[in-house]
Amino acid sequence: MTNKFNAKKTGVFDSKVEKFVYGKLLPLQEQGLIRSLRRCNFSFLIIPEIADYTIVEKQLKTKIKRIEKKVIVERAARYTPDFIYFDCETNEYVALEVKSFITRKQHDYPLRRKLFRWRLRDHNARGRSQWRFDEIEF
């Protein structure tokens, strides 16, 4: 199966290059240089949703009940890296993205990447677990 960027899906991976990178990371995990390697199956919130609240009147049998209803104005923006793992040498979690030169420049990826890096910097400044964003360009 080919997607719009002509990347051929290889089983669970979105491209041959992702599969290749995963194959290179597995020996590092076996050597103990990294741990907890996994394909990222969750997304990070980079911009929360924007919602308004309106009062809705609901007719009951004997009275009118007012209910506050949440209306989503803008959906949340999320970022899903290709892989995440823990780097034992630097004691950092790593979010790894595999992108071609062309897809790196297209659509909303540059903005999402900047927002994700900004979120990680903010997270790291709060003294929590340290995260790093790495990108492999092919």
Where are these regions (language model features)?
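Electrostatic, structured charged patches in enzyme active sites and in nucleic-acid/phosphate-binding
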Residues: 1-138
